[in-house]
């Protein structure tokens, strides 16, 4: 088994059970038919030197950004994303609507923050016109129930749940 993890965690894993592949920010790797670009996220890690990561996936046909545990985007990540167009954005949406003042806003996105970023992604051509935004990492205390949230949201938003599969 190969474990692909942020490089500061690599020394914490017992290597006799795994092959360790330390991931470095902005250094693309290949796993099977996928190219994956780790990007820095805006979140506090557990280790002093840790850089929490978002991931941009490519396979020659589609690409998507997977970004949980992070809020807004770091400028260095934005500069890289501007060079790409992707088919889907899977994003941390810990905080729902009407929770202004919640302390988690410095490490996790709120739905209003995502709406602002989404407008920019579409306007700048980073998200394709038909691209979905999948909301994940939702705090159950900061959102209505699944059905209520889905009813409130239209394209481009989908609400993830345990076992959710999104076909691009």
Residue ranges of predicted features:
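Core dinuclear metal-dependent hydrolase active-site scaffold
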Residues: 20-77, 162-168
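Cap/insert and terminal regions of metallo-dependent hydrolase folds
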Residues: 72-164
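Short, well-ordered, mixed-charge alpha-helical segments that flank or form enzyme active sites
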Residues: 1, 45-47, 142-143
């Amino acid at each position: 088994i190969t474990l692909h993890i942020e490089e500061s965690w690599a020394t914490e894993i017992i290597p006799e059970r795994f092959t360790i592949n330390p991931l470095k920010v902005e250094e693309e790797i290949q796993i099977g038919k996928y190219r994956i670009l780790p990007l820095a996220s805006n979140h506090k890690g557990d280790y002093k030197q840790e850089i929490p990561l978002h991931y941009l996936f490519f396979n020659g046909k589609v690409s998507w950004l997977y970004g949980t545990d992070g809020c807004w985007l770091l400028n260095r990540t934005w500069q890289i994303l501007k060079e790409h167009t992707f088919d889907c954005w899977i994003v941390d949406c810990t905080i729902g609507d009407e929770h202004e003042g919640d302390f988690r806003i410095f490490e996790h996105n709120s739905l209003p923050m995502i709406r602002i970023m989404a407008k920019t992604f579409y306007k700048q051509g980073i998200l394709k016109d038909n691209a979905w935004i999948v909301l994940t990492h939702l705090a159950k205390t900061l959102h209505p129930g699944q059905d209520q949230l889905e009813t409130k949201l239209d394209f481009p938003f989908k609400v993830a749940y345990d076992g959710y599969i999104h076909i691009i």
